[in-house]
Amino acid sequence: NLYRRGIYTHWQRMFLHPSLLAFDAPSREECTVERPRSNTPQQALVLLNDPTYVEAARVFAARMIREGGKTSSQRLAWSYLQVLSRKIEPFEEKLLGSLLEKHLASYRANMADRDSLSKVGMKAAPADLDAAELAAYTSIARVILNLHETITRQ
């Protein structure tokens, strides 16, 4: 039951799940017809640091590597189509490509950071993928999944 959708999340009366609280979940004390829209820095921090979202980003990063193509450019384009349903703009590709190279160099040099990122969550990191590459793509997936365009419905 770990990977069920949020609609099946157990709600406690006295203690609301922190992720739901950050995203303005209504209290159970009264009926709510329409939820307010908000976009706060706290929500961005939850999406970047909550183990649930870090694990989701790592799983998506593994898909980027396996299904996205052979080159980083193909993988970035694939990820944008999957998450945002649109093509990646050239400036976005350039920006994310340079960020990917920076993170790849960092994770190749720092084994402790790479290993700690691979242990977040309940799902084990795939053993058949390069750990540094997976960690770097996880960082990119976290950026893409935290875009305003991704989390805010228009």
In which residue ranges do the predicted regions lie?
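C-terminal structured "cap/appendage" subdomains that terminate the fold
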Residues: 65-138
